[in-house]
């Protein structure tokens, strides 16, 4: 999907949502944690802090227990306390390193942060279409996860990946390859898909810069034919932009969610 198409889709969604019911994170007065104050690849730890901070009072306990008065101090504490532990899923590596952190290790960090405060377990789900599943069904499933987590007081964390259509030396042909991934936190969406079965609007916190933005999750995969993922139109996102080669087709996908349901 082109940037202009993404903008037009976002404008259209604003029109559709004029009468739609919205669900929001409980603590909308929270200030975003900015990963760039600490490490450029700290979106995982920063997103956990944002999810807990924007959540209900009981989830805020996990944020308030992290010492520090600024993004850098809090992020570094989360990394040193929980992120530098050995991964339970990949032998010989730490949970967080210079490449960032993966989804399952991030879940482990989240639950260890919660254990101290008697908070319920946080789950994750990789969102791919089953062989006979329609894209609209996957969209509905993803939306249900987001809404349920918001209702339970925890803004969910989404994994967004940028794919690029490029040559493979091994396969000697062009195919779609993931070139970058990023975590964002959803703080607002519609309660149902009744008026828009192919997309839903989101308001999210982007820890890369510490800002809130708007976008849409949709069933269109553009030129990424047979994509198993949902598409993401995030006009303000810079995910993987520096890795795109000149003239290369790229697209953003929504591949997984971390939350409470």
What are these regions (language model features)?
Residues 5-15:
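Bacterial N-terminal signal peptides
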Residues 90-190:
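Predominantly the structural core of cysteine protease catalytic domains
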Residues 1-2:
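N-terminal secretory signal peptides that target proteins for export/translocation
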Residues 78-82, 138-150, 252-261:
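Generic hydrophobic, helix-prone segments enriched in Leu/Val/Ile
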Residues 37, 151-154, 198:
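Short, well-ordered loop/turn elements at secondary-structure boundaries
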Residues 15-115, 247, 260-261:
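Active-site-adjacent structural segments surrounding the nucleophilic cysteine of cysteine proteases
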Residues 144, 161-261:
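Active-site signature of cysteine proteases
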């Amino acid at each position: 999907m082109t940037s202009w198409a993404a903008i037009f889709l976002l404008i259209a969604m604003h029109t559709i949502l004029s009468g739609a019911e919205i669900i929001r994170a409980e603590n909308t007065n929270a200030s975003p944690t900015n990963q760039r104050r600490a490490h450029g690849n700290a979106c995982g730890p920063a997103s956990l802090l944002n999810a807990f901070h924007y959540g209900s009072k009981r989830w805020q306990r996990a944020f308030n227990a992290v010492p520090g008065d600024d993004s850098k101090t809090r992020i570094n504490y989360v990394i040193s306390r929980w992120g530098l532990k050995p991964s339970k899923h990949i032998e010989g590596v730490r949970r967080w390193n210079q490449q960032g952190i993966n989804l399952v290790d991030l879940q482990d960090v989240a639950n260890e942060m919660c254990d101290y405060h008697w908070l319920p377990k946080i789950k994750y789900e990789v969102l791919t279409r089953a062989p006979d599943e329609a894209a609209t069904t996957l969209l509905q499933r993803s939306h249900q996860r987001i809404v349920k987590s918001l209702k339970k007081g925890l803004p969910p964390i989404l994994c967004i990946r940028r794919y690029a259509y490029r040559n493979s030396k091994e396969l000697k042909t062009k195919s779609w390859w993931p070139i970058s991934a990023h975590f964002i936190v959803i703080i607002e969406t519609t309660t149902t898909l009744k008026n828009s079965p192919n997309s839903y609007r989101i308001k999210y916190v982007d820890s890369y810069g510490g800002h809130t933005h708007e976008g849409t999750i949709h069933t269109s995969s553009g030129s990424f034919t047979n994509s198993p993922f949902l598409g993401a139109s995030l006009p303000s996102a810079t995910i993987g932009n520096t890795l795109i080669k000149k003239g290369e087709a790229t697209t953003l996908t929504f591949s997984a969610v971390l939350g409470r349901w």
